[in-house]
Amino acid sequence: MNDLIIKNNKKGSCDVIIKYKCKKSDENIKRRKSSHKYIKNKSVVLGRSIMTNKKEKLKGALKYKGSKKEIKICNKKSMIKNDKDENTTLKSMKSDNFKFSRRGFILSFTGNLEDFYNLSKEPLGKGTYGCVYKATDKLLKISRAVKVVSKKKLKNIPRFRQEIDIMKNLDHPNVVKLLETFEDSNQIYLVMELCTGGELFDKIVKKGCFVETFASFIMKQIFSVLNYLHIRNICHRDIKPENFLFYDMTPESLIKIIDFGLASYFTHNNYEMKTKAGTPYYVAPQVLTGSYNYKCDMWSSGVLFYILLCGYPPFFGESDHEILSMVKKGKYQFKGKEWNNISEEAKDLIKRCLTMDADKRICASEALQHPWFKKKKYAFNMDMKMDIHVLENFKNYGLLLKFQKLAMTIIAQQSNDYDVEKLKSTFLVLDEDGKGYITKEQLKKGLEKDGLKLPYNFDLLLDQIDSDGSGKIDYTEFIAAALDRKQLSKKLIYCAFRVFDVDNDGEITTAELAHILYNGNKKGNITQRDVNRVKRMIRDVDKNNDGKIDFHEFSEMMKLKF
């Protein structure tokens, strides 16, 4: 049986040595003058865990400094725990400047989609350039939605690729998630999360009109996602009920915006958009003149808001020509019995959305602060609180291996809303101003409000949660850090593994990990330092030292505790 020796050195630090018979050329531990130690050439940072072979019983910190020592030794691991150690580890991670974006995990493949998915015979919906089908992952049996677009019908393929690029950049609870794309000689396939609750349009047709409290629930989501888009200089240009889907059939289901086919990047406040795009009932007057800005979305949302409350549009006619003529005049009324019990605050917000002068028209961030939302607040999971387990998960996430953080981000991205229901609701409550992200101050405030004591190194933890270095906590970043790794299903772990395993051969190579890590995450060429970083990430979890990671090693990595 191999010996595990804990030995105090002259400087008062603690060395952990694995002792067994070996040749001089096969040293078990190589020492350096730093916080790093090595086991068989595997770099171990203070406070971290690594995968080891059968002869190596150690998983954890190799060096410890401080007067108080808490050393836990068992068959599988040796851990040295101390708040100062944890702080040192977080500081070393911050100095390493390891940052990445989730968009790099949305991969594009060439080949046959049906090698991986079974498509439904009947489409869920039809569009100008193709259809949307329900798709079932052949191996994992997970349901997705697949938009199948014919290249022959596409008038402008580069324009369509811009739609894909826009979707890759979006990370918001009210935006349908793009998961991966496929392309063959005839078609392009967009694999997205599946929404089963139907269109907002269908619900309006069925219901007729809605009470103000439910309308506020819908409009807050619409203004929130528009605020998110406009902050990123993206104009949707086709806001209408048909382009919002309910995630599921539950009464409190969120809505998701879809179809970015007409979306466009813009320069803030300039009237540089010229293309006449949109749908007659919802199109803004400036679009018809051929010179408009992002506030065309606010006009369209005002029309949608009007319809929610009464069941019919403010501008109507027997033909598109008549409808557009009414839009150009911009005249509408709040007459009819449907408006008798509608509040003045609701009417005021509609008026501010349907202001003819775009410069005076309300923007999404202003709309979210309108008094109507406070008066007609929809009580959607407003009692959602963060418990101590979420804070513990944040702390654990900060100490994860780089590879593990990548995997947790992919799992958060691949998870459906059912898997993260409570965390999603918590995120929405914390996002008080509806920007689609949480500031570090908002997260601190939310934790303290729920009676949780923040660790003294919380700012360092936040830097680790902010994986793309944007200075704020995006939706997927929050979910990735808050997820309980003990609750991860084998299916979700395999979902992440399969993203890394680009060629689908059952193993993750250095080249594949580099492709994932730097795909869309790095400007310029990959340097030797980047390559060395990836090699270290592989080495940290490569249990059998073959230079590759199989699913067993990957699964074991995801189970490591701290």
Swiss-Prot record:
The residues the record assigns to binding Ca(2+) 1 are D466, D468, S470, K472, E477
Q: Which cofactor does it need?
A: Mg(2+)
Q: Where in the cell is it found?
A: Cytoplasm
Q: Where does ATP bind?
A: L124, G125, K126, G127, T128, Y129, G130, C131, V132, K147
Question: GO molecular function, one example?
Answer: calmodulin binding
> Which residues of this UniProt protein bind Ca(2+) 3?
D542, N544, D546, K548, E553
What EC numbers are recorded for this enzyme?
2.7.11.1
Keywords, sorted A to Z: ATP-binding, Calcium, Cytoplasm, Developmental protein, Differentiation, Kinase, Magnesium, Metal-binding, Nucleotide-binding, Repeat, Serine/threonine-protein kinase, Transferase
Tell me the residue numbers annotated for binding Ca(2+) 2. D501, D503, D505, E507, E512
Residue interval(s) of motif J domain autoinhibitory motif: 393-401
The positions flagged as active site in the entry are D238 (proton acceptor)
Chain ranges of the Protein kinase domain:
118-373
For this entry, list what GO says about its biological process.
cell differentiation; intracellular signal transduction; protein phosphorylation
User: Pfam families this protein is in?
Assistant: EF-hand_7, Pkinase
Q: Which domain of life is it from?
A: Eukaryota
Q: According to its record, what are the GO cellular component terms?
A: cytoplasm; nucleus
Activity: how regulated: Activated by calcium. Upon calcium binding to the EF-hand domain 2, the C-terminus of the junction domain (J domain) undergoes a conformational change which results in the dissociation of the pseudo-substrate inhibitory motif from the catalytic domain. This, in turn, may facilitate the autophosphorylation of the activation loop at Thr-279, which leads to the kinase activation.
Q: Where is this motif: J domain EF-hand interaction motif?
A: 402-411
UniProt record similarity statement:
Belongs to the protein kinase superfamily. Ser/Thr protein kinase family. CDPK subfamily.
Function field: Calcium-dependent protein kinase which acts as a sensor and effector of intracellular Ca(2+) levels probably in part downstream of cGMP-activated PKG kinase. In the mosquito midgut, regulates the gliding motility of the ookinete which is essential for the ookinete to invade the midgut epithelium. However, another study showed that while required for ookinete invasion of the midgut epithelium, is not required for ookinete gliding motility.
The text the record gives for the protein's domains is: The EF-hand domain 1 cannot bind calcium due to the presence of a Lys instead of an Asp at position 435 and a Gln instead of a Glu at position 442 preventing calcium binding. The EF-hand domains 3 and 4 probably bind calcium constitutively when calcium levels are low, while the EF-hand domain 2 binds calcium following an increase in calcium levels. The junction domain (J domain) is composed of 2 motifs that maintain the kinase inactive. The N-terminal autoinhibitory motif acts as a pseudosubstrate inhibiting the catalytic domain while the C-terminal motif binds the EF-hand domains.
Task: Supply the name of the protein.
Answer: Calcium-dependent protein kinase 3
What's the source species for this entry? Plasmodium falciparum (isolate 3D7)
Name of the gene:
CDPK3
